[in-house]
Amino acid sequence: MIAKPVFLLAFMALPALADAKPPLRDVTEIDNELYYIAIANEISDYCPSISGRRLKAINVMLGLRSKANSLGYTDREIRAYVESDAEKDRMRAKGEAYLAQQGVTYDNLDSFCVLGRKEIDRNSAIGVYLRAN
């Protein structure tokens, strides 16, 4: 007789499991786009001849919020992800690894400009958020 209540409890928990969402960091469409914006922002912060296309980035971020909402994430969950120190650290480490792979160093600010121009010329996922001054 104990098996029946346990089965019922387990069965009642199934909808909650079905509604479980992955962490936003695992939603690549959202996480990757935020990563591209972060790299572009870093380039524009350190290269005086390149500026960020901030309105475009803001518009895309609003779209990402809408996408996350449509996937069932609340504004509170989205804010927690975006403001999380752990997520900021993860994104920074990922970005610094990419910059280093591209030969960018904080000791050579022109290296940010070289990468920025390359990204703009390629019209890459990062380059679309940059503009040469």
Each model region followed by its residue ranges:
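Sec-dependent N-terminal signal peptides
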Residues: 4-14
